[in-house]
Amino acid sequence: METHNHDVPWESAYGYVQALKHGDTIYISGQLSHDGADLVAPAPVENGRATSFEQMEAQMRQTYVNAAKLLERFGATLDNVVEEVVYVLDIPAAFAVAGKVRKEAYGRPDPQVASTLVGTNGLAFPEQLVEIKFIARV
């Protein structure tokens, strides 16, 4: 098996790898909107909860960028993705931007990717609005 990480503090704190290739399948752990150890477009938080979903699009874009970086380390691209699961704090906010962001990320008007959108009440960091896991085939 081949593995890759982003080398961010929460990998060792939680104890996992960002991506793992087994055979011809690449499994990408839930990706967040970060650039190194810094969160990108963090949502405002009050009492441990996001108070606005206005950064959904920016966070979603960075999440696809992070997935693409991992795939590149295996010699793959987002074109190799066969399935994604999108976890969000607010389904209407995500649905409003997901089509546009996904089409741009995959570079086509009809991404050939099985996709599931799931609403959840929390993610790894309270500032996060979206997390996406991927499966790719090479």
Predicted regions and their residues:
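N-terminal presequence-like segments and the immediate start of the first folded domain
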Residues: 1-65, 69-82, 88-138
